[in-house]
């Protein structure tokens, strides 16, 4: 019997809605990355984008464990000499785009390459509880019930 290899035309993508309120960032990101890659499916094929579309709401209400809220630093470079920039997780979460903490965590758990970039386009993260994807009829995934460690009361 030959190894099963799914073709891109055979892929069935579902829409999944996750409420991130009170969830631990790393645990949430690992579940999202698994769903984006399609590793939760029996038809997983490493070189095919067979993951689901994931919508994350309330990304501004995520929780970091330990002292990471104050101490975790995100670095980036502008491209100019001496252009290294840094922000703490607190500055990002309390700033204009709090959803970037979740996006970065997931981005670093997905493979770096053309397939990983395509899979990241299937992730939509929103700071509030509103999202424009009601027409897709997303299925709600309760991450808090998967494991008691996924939730941390602030």
UniProtKB/Swiss-Prot annotation:
Keyword terms: Ribonucleoprotein, Ribosomal protein
GO cellular component terms listed in the entry, alphabetical order: cytosolic large ribosomal subunit
Gene Ontology BP terms: negative regulation of translation; translation
Gene3D superfamilies: Ribosomal protein L13
One Pfam family recorded for the sequence: Ribosomal_L13
Oligomer and partners: Part of the 50S ribosomal subunit.
UniProt record similarity statement: Belongs to the universal ribosomal protein uL13 family.
Designated name of the protein: Large ribosomal subunit protein uL13
Phylogenetic classification of the source organism: Bacteria, Pseudomonadati, Pseudomonadota, Alphaproteobacteria, Hyphomicrobiales
């Amino acid at each position: 019997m030959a190894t099963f290899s799914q073709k891109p035309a055979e892929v069935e993508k579902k829409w999944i809605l996750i409420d991130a309120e009170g969830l631990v960032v790393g645990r949430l990101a690992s579940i999202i990355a698994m769903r984006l890659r399609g590793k939760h499916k029996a038809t997983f094929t490493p070189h095919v984008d067979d993951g689901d579309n994931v919508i994350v709401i309330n990304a501004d209400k995520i929780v970091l464990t330990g002292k990471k809220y104050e101490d975790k630093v995100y670095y980036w470079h502008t491209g100019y000499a001496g252009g290294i920039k840094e922000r703490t997780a607190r500055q990002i979460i309390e700033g204009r785009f709090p959803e970037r903490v979740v996006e970065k965590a997931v981005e670093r758990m997905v493979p770096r390459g053309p397939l990983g970039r395509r899979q990241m386009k299937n992730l939509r993260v929103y700071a509030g509880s509103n999202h424009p994807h009601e027409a897709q009829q997303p299925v709600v995934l309760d991450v808090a019930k998967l494991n008691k460690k996924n939730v941390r009361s602030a």
